[in-house]
Amino acid sequence: MIGGEEHCVFFSLGVIDELQSRFGKTVGQLLVMLKDPVEGPGYLREILTALLNDEGIRLKNGKRYTKEEVGSLVMQKEIPGLTISLFLAFNDAMPEPEDERNDEESELLDIAQLLIIATSKMGYSEEEIFNMTPKKFFTLFEKYLELNGKKKDTRAAIDMLP
C-alpha cells in the first residue's frame, strides 16, 4: 500500500535495468543501502518511483510519478514495511537455485520409489497408500529414507546452531 492505494509492483527487467544503469550497482546492493539511515530513504524513493512507473506501463493506465510525488506519498512509519516488501518482491523475482530444484526432483523420485516399495515389498495396496493420513504417509516416508541411508541427521544441524 503506497499513498493509500494498493499496487502490484515487481522487479521486471525494465526496472532492474533502469536502477542498475542509474546507480551503477546491482538491485541487491541498492536494497542493502535501504538499511542506511541517511541514504536509505533516497534509495527507497528512487526504487519505488521506478516500480510504480513500471506498473503504469504494464497496466497501460498512463500513470507516471516523479520521485518528489512518490516521496510525498510515503510516511515515515511506512518505511520499514515498504523496505521489507521490496526485499520480498526482489526475492520472488530471483530464480530458484539449481540445487534446490534438484532436491525437489529427487524427493519426488523418492516418493515414487516409496510407493513402489510400499506396494511390492511392504504389502500395502495402492488404495491403502492413497487413503493414508499425511502423518502416516510421512512416517512411512521417513522410515524409507532411514532404511536407504538418505535421511539427514537433523540433530547435528541443530547442534551447530549458535
How would you describe each model-predicted region?
Residues 1-8, 13-50, 54-162:
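Charged interaction scaffolds used for protein-protein
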